[in-house]
Amino acid sequence: MGKTLFQKIWDAHTVGILPDGRTQMFIATHLLHEVTSPQAFGMVRDLGLTVRHPERTFATVDHIIPTDNQAEPFADATADAMIRELRRNCAENGIRFFDLPTGLQGIVHMVGPELGITQPGMTIVCGDSHTATHGAFGAIAMGIGTTQVRDVLATQTLALSPLKVRRINVNGKLAPGVRAKDVALHIIGLLGAKGGLGFAYEYGGEVIDAMSMDERMTLCNMSIEGAARCGYVNPDRTTVEYIKGRLFAPTGADWDKAVERWLGFASDADAEYDEIVEIDGASIEPTLTWGISPDQNTGISGSTPNPSDAADDDERKMINEALEYMKFPADMPLKGLPVQVCFVGSCTNGRISDFREVAALIKGRHVAPGIRALAVPGSQMTARQCEEEGIADIFREAGFEWRLAGCSMCLAMNPDKLQGDQLCASSSNRNFKGRQGSPTGRTLLMSPAMVAAAALTGKVSDAREVFSLN
């Protein structure tokens, strides 16, 4: 009987089985940022312990970083204290910290892949919800809480419960103008915001095989929005070529050995899955959210739902709550809905390929009057690449605010925030109430191409029509 990638990695990292049935797992790589690590370091210190494997631990700063002016001290005293605390903790424990002056700082889920830290076959954890991003490389990557961050710092292990594995096959071919973000939102809408509870998602099929690593990262990044503990893609030659030559990638004879080992983690042809879901890629259209959860979404040709069509009282209640918060009527077409803010960035869609695509679409055009448009690269490496390729200038000339690297408007932990009831077309990952900084601000999740279309027209628009992508 063959094994899935999940089973292979789980078995390879099992230290032992605990009396309660959980598995004590060795953690290959631990990623840190400034928000969830201070308390964990404090607990380790209070216990009289030290960091067990600093060489397997990497840190960066991303959530609280201002993206307009990163001169220190920061205007926000709390943010300034947080970065200083992370510096202290990393220095005291010998942890590699990709700080602002290094030129390698960025969102943690971009820094790991860009530097070659993220590799197939690893167990990877971080005190951040979107750690599943690293699963794009054929790793088992999970977000953890602060007490678990403490445990990994002190022991390099973690007590975890086994997961079921759901294989999600997306076959056929995507229509022109349909992107990885649309696939991710479609899957979440199909399976639900709680559909992945207790599961690891294995993404496969012709559409996934054809995706670039950036696209696979977008897909895996959104796994948690469907409640999956992790999501991954089997490693292949696309994976290998992405890692090759990066700062932490193996070299020489070690490279050849690593590649052979990495590819061996891919699920066997006769592996058995707990569930298999089949999706026709051709059926997916540009997709966007209409409510306050990522599963509340529809294709660009769709409308807000009618509560009277709900399957049960619970669903009816959720629809009513979402429509009330979003200030939308039932049965309202989303196409043509005016927006006030547009955001390209985040660990979901803040990569070089995202900015290349949008730059090609907006070149020679301009943001619609009255629209605030932000472009925020997810890392300093990506920002430099955009400057070198002339991409940043295209955004500036089109009327976008070109920002420094950080999480920015994805969440309300830095100065980039919505005001009042503003409606934002966003390439980020969550549309929860108040997520983007204003307690009444509203978010429409969509692909970068769709954000670009909204920025140029001032309203929700079909990117295929605006940019003649058909």
Swiss-Prot record:
Annotated catalysed reactions: (2R,3S)-3-isopropylmalate = (2S)-2-isopropylmalate
Pfam families from the UniProt entry: Aconitase
Key words of the record: 4Fe-4S, Amino-acid biosynthesis, Branched-chain amino acid biosynthesis, Iron, Iron-sulfur, Leucine biosynthesis, Lyase, Metal-binding
Family annotation (InterPro entries): 3-IsopropMal_deHydase_lsu, Acnase/IPM_dHydase_lsu_aba_1/3, Acoase/IPM_deHydtase_lsu_aba, Aconitase_4Fe-4S_BS, Aconitase_4Fe-4S_dom, IPM_dehydratase_rel_enz, IPMI_cat
EC number of the protein: 4.2.1.33
Organism domain of life: Bacteria
Subunit text: Heterodimer of LeuC and LeuD.
Protein name per UniProt: 3-isopropylmalate dehydratase large subunit
Gene source species: Akkermansia muciniphila (strain ATCC BAA-835 / DSM 22959 / JCM 33894 / BCRC 81048 / CCUG 64013 / CIP 107961 / Muc)
Name of encoding gene: leuC
